[in-house]
């Protein structure tokens, strides 16, 4: 019998993300917005769009739409780099900080609810297995 592990993991990611989107809807944000805000917040100040896309692991054109939405919401600003007019630097606005804290609380609570009934050891084991799978895949890609 063929393993459905890949499909099972993909389904888990989809339903997890859908739950996060549902929980963030009252804040008019999505999981994609959160991942972007979180990475802008944790990286050194005024990263370029290229650096941010690499940190998130997506292509720059995919990032631009999300940044447009975050800028429209007043959570970030973008300005042209002085030494490279093609590049844009991203900065969180003062209004972003309380939103980031509120979203972090929603994400943390949701994560706790998702992991309810699963021991810390089980979570650690799962994380280690996922890491090993990822390393195996990276190794195979580099062959």
UniProtKB/Swiss-Prot annotation:
Keyword Secreted on entry: no
InterPro entries per record: HTH_MarR-typ, MarR/SlyA-like, Tscrpt_reg_MarR-type_CS, Tscrpt_reg_SlyA, WH-like_DNA-bd_sf, WH_DNA-bd_sf
Domain of life the protein comes from: Bacteria
This protein's record includes keyword Transcription regulation: yes
MF GO annotations: DNA binding; DNA-binding transcription factor activity
PROSITE patterns named among the record's database cross-references: HTH_MARR_1 (PS01117), HTH_MARR_2 (PS50995)
GO-annotated biological processes: response to stress
Domain HTH marR-type: start-end pairs: 2-135
Keywords associated with the record: Activator, DNA-binding, Repressor, Transcription, Transcription regulation
Residues within the DNA-binding region(s): 49-72
Oligomeric and partner information: Homodimer.
Family: Belongs to the SlyA family.
Function: Transcription regulator that can specifically activate or repress expression of target genes.
Alphabetized HAMAP family for the sequence: HTH_type_SlyA
Name under which the protein is recorded: Transcriptional regulator SlyA
Gene this protein is translated from: slyA
